[in-house]
Amino acid sequence: DINLIPEECKDKASTLVVYTPAVPQEHAELTYFRENGFDIHKRSQVLGIITRSSKGLCVAGTHGKTTTSTMAAHLLHQSHVGCIAFLGGISKNYGTNLLLSATSPYTVIEADEFDRSFHWLSPWMSVITATDPDHLDIYGTKEAYLESFRHYTTLIQPGGALILHKGLEMQADVQPGVATYTYSRNEGDFHAENIRIGNGEIFIDFVAPDTRINDIQLGVPVSINIENGVAAMALAHLSGATDEEIKQGMASFRGVDRRFDFKLKNDRIVFLSDYAHHPAEIAQSVKSVRELYQDKKITVIFQPHLYTRTRD
């Protein structure tokens, strides 16, 4: 309904219209802006413009990018480094998916591969968490999906870095001057050691090529957050956050809405909401629950989110 458009947004000189692929081209309000000559950009195009005017810290991958990018944003935001952040979920620390800074050169962005949106970005540094095929309604084949990630690595700017999950099937193709690191839970340039899980808590030691941070407590004690945390800490470390800032930030991280989100927790019942749609993600979620609650019965309610995604 174009009558819902605020009057101040009908001034072409001062209005930038930003939309996502979820908005149909025939949507009435989008049609109004297009037919009246407004400046219109996809969200991914705007994020691309932002990464060309700041140092983009981007997190891409089939799984884990929302939690990892939100965690990295929290680590930097509460450190002396600071950051701007455009996230794919609502941070429970801040109650928003947008963080601002007047002084930091860094912008944390969740790099979405849907519709090849991440090809608009110019990352300074990027994590790639996983490349299990997804969005096959867009890509068609596994090979095309992997190729899109290879092309994405060519966009990382010289002087920056690629932090690649160890063992991925894809081939990176970075420009000269881009440092390449690996990470995982247990091995790689960045990894965790001395992992302690028990009594609803997780402690780890973080190992980097040039430092080690001992006795880090995970603010959201879920086993998958060990790996997510290693990637987030790697980004924060390479961006200049101190060891103590990283340690404090990991302990104070409160998670993301709908990402292993505890809705009810008492002695009798634990109710979790988790946005896991890919088979690998669902398996990891169940594994994480089982590790935390070894003696409880697990009941799963699965909501198919998209027909094409569930079919593929």
Q: Residue spans of the language-model regions?
A:
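Short internal beta-strands
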Residues: L162-K166, T299-F302
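Phosphate-binding loop of NTP-binding sites
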Residues: P6-K12, P21-L164, M170-A179, V230, ...
